[in-house]
Amino acid sequence: MSMLSTTAARLISTYLSTHPIVTGYDMALLISYSYSVATRYGEGAAALAAQMYDAIAALSDVYVPPAVPAKTATIEETARSVQGARLFSKDPDVTASAVSRLVKQAGEDTTLQNAMRDGAEAAWIPSGDTCAFCITLASRGWQRVSKKSLKNGIHAEHIHNNCDCVHAVRFNGDGDVEGYDPEEYYQMYKSQPGTPDQKINALRRKAYAENKEAINAQKRSAYAKRQELNSSAAEEIKID
């Protein structure tokens, strides 16, 4: 599913490198294109998540109805994401990440919606450079999925931009994910001082301090990439 989200982000970045957003019409075209990308790759993410869910059920010797792929983002949801991203920053990567998140959302919604239907448990599994918020969620361990686990009973609430973490499911309390230790994450969270919000902020500052060089290198690489794309776009429209 990560590849689908990455491809969606790349398509949006490429589009913005050749289509400056100047007028309201330009924004409407961007939203329309983003919606088509979110739909196409969101359907793929949902279908893949459904296949994985069915495979886990089969390996667990649990008989449940075939998983139903979740619906992809609506045009209204896409518009809110794109407009919000553009208000936050004109950086193409920010908009690309927002659309990428919509793709991932379809996959995570599929996992949780079917888990709720079948009374399964889910856990938030960290991956990559895990942020403070995701560490906090991972510390909760395996929990029975209910309507409270889903925003408005539909959407997974934990999805944010540039996140590689995923929901894992298990049936009847059996099974685990290799390397996932919720107690370890809980101790990381518990060891920080203050209120829950202060604990998360402390974890965030600690993670940034530990990964400062890598984060800055990533930012420089992204900036260089944008400059290259903008240069290529300028060459394409150059009039002799």
What are these regions (language model features)?
Residues M1-H160, V169-D240:
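Domain-core detector
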